[in-house]
């Protein structure tokens, strides 16, 4: 079948159902608005083809060549595109559900506002792709290649990025909740204003990383290295950082309510105006830290070391400080008796 013949069927409003077009030469075909059901395009040449606003259900594009194709506003359901070449495709507002992109190349593609649900992107390449406000919900992403991709405002929900290629990836306001990033070398990576709630970053090296205004609520960061990291105004409520190293990190105005810093090292870190009521930090090292105006009320600082730390006007209300070394305690605000009575009052 020629590209013109197939295009005429589409223009005539026919539902293209059950055709075997494996290996067909259909480059440049205009199939916009077509309805395709169970069509086999395996190995077909569809380079530069137009599928704008097309509906594709249960179709096979395995190893097909779709480089430069236009799939904008197309809807794909239960389609297989394993090993397909989709490099440079235009997928603006494209929707995909239960599709298999395993090993496919979407390098340099435009995925702006595209939405994919319950799809497989294992070993797929999105290198250099533009994925602004793109969403991958409940998709598998093992070994995905995101090098030099732009993920501004994108949402990858519960992504497996343990083996993802992230060199040069641009994250900005990206949702990566429950991401698997444990044990990785992420030195210098930037996650500005990203959502990493309950993400697993345990044991990862985030030395010099940019995490400003990043939401890390409940994130697992045990044993992570965050030396010199920028955590300005980051939200670390309930984050788990036992044994982590944050030497020289900037935590200015960071929110650490209920965070666990047991045995962590924060030598020379800046916690100016940090909000950390209920902080759990026994045996932590706050040596040479700037804790000016920090709120540590109710914190567990048992055997913590604040040697050479600055605590000017810091709030040390009702802290647990057994065995703690706090030489600049006089510069801080101690327990407020009236507040303590109010907090411990109970009806008789």
Report each predicted region and the residues it spans.
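Tandem repeat scaffolds
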Residues: 1-348
